[in-house]
From Swiss-Prot:
Name of the protein described by the UniProt record: Putative alpha-1,3-mannosyltransferase MNN12
Gene3D superfamilies referenced in this protein's UniProt entry, alphabetically: Spore Coat Polysaccharide Biosynthesis Protein SpsA, Chain A
Recorded name of the encoding gene: MNN12
Cytoplasmic domain ranges by topology: 1-13
Subcellular location: Golgi apparatus membrane
Domain of life: Eukaryota
Cellular compartments per GO CC: Golgi apparatus; Golgi membrane
Species: Candida albicans (strain SC5314 / ATCC MYA-2876)
Top enzyme category: transferase
Biological role: Responsible for addition of the terminal mannose residues to the outer chain of core N-linked polysaccharides and to O-linked mannotriose. Implicated in late Golgi modifications.
The protein's annotated pathway: Protein modification; protein glycosylation
Amino acid sequence: MIEKLTIKRSRQKVIAYSVIIIWLMIVNIWLLNNYHLNSSTLTRHGNGDNLIDEDDDSSSSSEYSIYNELDTENYLGQQHQEEDVPNSQSTDNSLIKPTSPAKNSFKDDITIKILQKHLQKQQNNPKDIRTKDSHAEIYNQIFENHPQIDTILGNLNFNQRCQLFFQNLFIKDNNWILNVKDKKIKLENKNDFKFNDFKKSHLNEFKRQFKTMKKLLEPNKIIHNKDFDNSIEFQDFIKMKYEQFWNRTMTYEQKIVDSISILRIFNKCYLIEEATSTTTTKNNKQDFIKDQFKLVDGIRRASKKNPSLPKFKPTKQEQMVNFDNENLSPSILEHRVYPWLSFEYPVYERWTGKVQYQPPKMANYVKDGNQKTTKKTKYNNDKYLSSFFLNRLKQKCNGRGLVLSISDLHVDVTVRLIHLLRALNNRYPIQIVYYDNLSKETKEKIVTAAREVMSHVPKSFERVAKYFPDDYLDNDQGGLPKQEIWFINTYNVIHADYKLQFRGFANKFLATLFNSFDEFILLDADTVLTQSPSYFFNLPQYLETGTFFYKDRTTYETRPKSDSIFFEKLGPSVIDSVMFNIPIMTSYTLNRSFFKGLFHYMESGLVVLNRDMHYSSFLTMVQMNFFEPVNSRIHGDKEIFWLAMAINGKQNYYFDENYAAAVGVMTPDIERTKPDKTLHESKELCSPHPGHISHDDNSLVWLNSGFFYCGQNDKVKFVEEFKHKSRLKHLNTLEAFKTFYYSPLRIENAIIPPMDLDIWAANNEDEPAKGWFGDPRYCSGYMWCAYDKIGGKTKSGKNTRLEGKIINFDEQAQDLFNYYGDVWVGME
């Protein structure tokens, strides 16, 4: 009996303890949700949470002034900021000037290190291989004011972090703006970063300066260069000059880091969240914050810190900058970050002459079902997000199409491209994007090429007719399919103060941003497609990543290491990653040949892009193009496309694995014998056209420089080129030579040369030492010869042989190339 009572009482105790434990867990969960996760009673403003605690009496503006010296706490805090952060009110509306780093770097904080490791693991990036981590200077101010980093990372939700970042920009300078016209930001000489290079490059200049200085100090003394060449005083003078150069350069680079960081964080905070190929209904920002709160709580409990998370308390100055619609609407930030925008839409003009002032709905004009694209990201009736012009622009874009950026100078090749697109049975609309003006004559030529009856095709069609659908030549509809043409005038989208900033290559980025498609293929006017546009839209890698890029020739032009370091610095910092979930650069980007020293990496004559997945990167492209130190390190626009994505924290871009090939007809072996009259092991193909070969099946998908054998005929000096007679030996007369240049390129073969930046394939067998050789004697300098093998035995017996790839196109492919070439050139 006693045993039964004991067992019964034990069970009762277990039940009671269990109830108490469950009750305590519920209380803790309630506290976590209502205390730790919400550090104060917050007032909702649109889509952001105000950092001001309305229950905190100290937040009442009537109780104190930030200028009241008798308020000891406030006065000392302000004094501390003024001492540590100089030039707090900039007078030139430019970005914050670099300040000295905090004495105790916040990057060394254990919480930040653990959170970053966790993020890298989630992103399948176990090792950080970067050599530089450069953050926006404003973080120094934020973490000096809030040295207990856990109060930010363990308390503030995503919107509150955004507010905190931009509040501090206003505290630093109420007139801050991303000044893209700052001409002081420049690259003095990218090859001078090492002291010895700098000294060698400027030695004579410094001798003159030093001599002038000495004459001013000692006017009666005759000074010769030999008197001071090796003097300590002169060496110190050079070191001083180098230090000045270095400090100027670091200042300019930090301004660019600040500008790109602010842009990146604004886009992350206030633009509609971008889709991925595997978009779910999860709110990524909320998931990121919830996960981080749990980790911060776990870190505090596991460490010697007080497990109770301190409450976040904004500084008095932060409380003065209140983001609400009546005081400081966050949409004002859009004007500060994008001062070059007029916040108007482009002018959209259909081929009929009808004009629209907002993006057209393409499904109303092209009714084949290809224009009914579904938005993966939506406003969800959020008036806050819709207050931003850039969000409205993104949401109004729709459908799929082709985009060209041209001027009147490009009308001839544009007409030829449109003829080719008709031959390729293209059904996608085409938008011609221009800046400022496109003449009436140019528009007439383009519309005529797109809409005229085109039922007569070259004789070469007979050999390929079987490869096209039965309705390919539908005479009732005007033969080859007519094209839906739109002209997009982007001049009015640029603020009047910045119109001169958009010339040349910048137009391509305007075309990227302001065409009206969700998905598009951006083309150069002289690009030649050998596959239909639908081929590119259906590439699996494009569907997965929202991009498809192609590589350039591997011409062994190199860049200094300082270039790679510079672009690394522009990427997201660790604190960007931890605060805003913007991933740092990984080996996916940093192991590319560009970062190892290759100068030409991407070819941008054909780019496939998805706006819904990469919109913020489009904006980063435009911003990067403003900076002279960026443009001085690349050729034209091409590298900015993929670099902008990596710098924006978006590394879901894709390159075809093949580098560009030379396409055409291989040089007969007998025409390039060795000095002893024996044949080379290597094969040679000389062509003015780089072509792009699919890694998947070795098919030719597109090529550059039009379809004339030589795309530079207006510049060619035919008499001089014909006299060389070292190539094209089958052409016996000047007239035949000239006719050949104006004929379509005939494509039978392609060569993708080998490439290894670490190997110069010198050899003793008269084989080429590098994969590409530019021959300036032909096609006005546009002739390049490619070799499938380079290197061989050296005098020491070493073998430097590297092998590339030869592609021999079958009869069907050659017949199609001939037909497309005849259409492009206009042959009967």
